[in-house]
Amino acid sequence: MLDAVIVGRVIQEYRESKGLSQEVVSGFADIGRTHLSAIERGVRKPTLETFFKLSEAMDIKPSELMKRIEAALKAP
């Protein structure tokens, strides 16, 4: 099972590495900024649809984002 905090952290770190704001990503993903904020803080888990929208908004393949999440879950 995925840890919501780790999922959120990976999404946030990737977004920030691309120099994208929450406003820009949430706008492209067609979700509220507060929803994205809750995902990044681990308060909410993204649905599969939202995960794909966020991936597209950040210009990363969903499979690549998932690999990053899996690596973070395995990290000590």
Predicted regions and their residues:
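Short, charged recognition helix plus adjacent turn
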Residues: 56, 64-76
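Alpha-helical residues within the helix-turn-helix
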Residues: 16, 27, 56
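A short, Lys/Arg-rich alpha-helix, primarily the initiator
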Residues: 1-17
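Helix-turn-helix DNA-binding elements, focusing on the entry/boundary residues of the two helices
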Residues: 11, 22, 33, 48-51
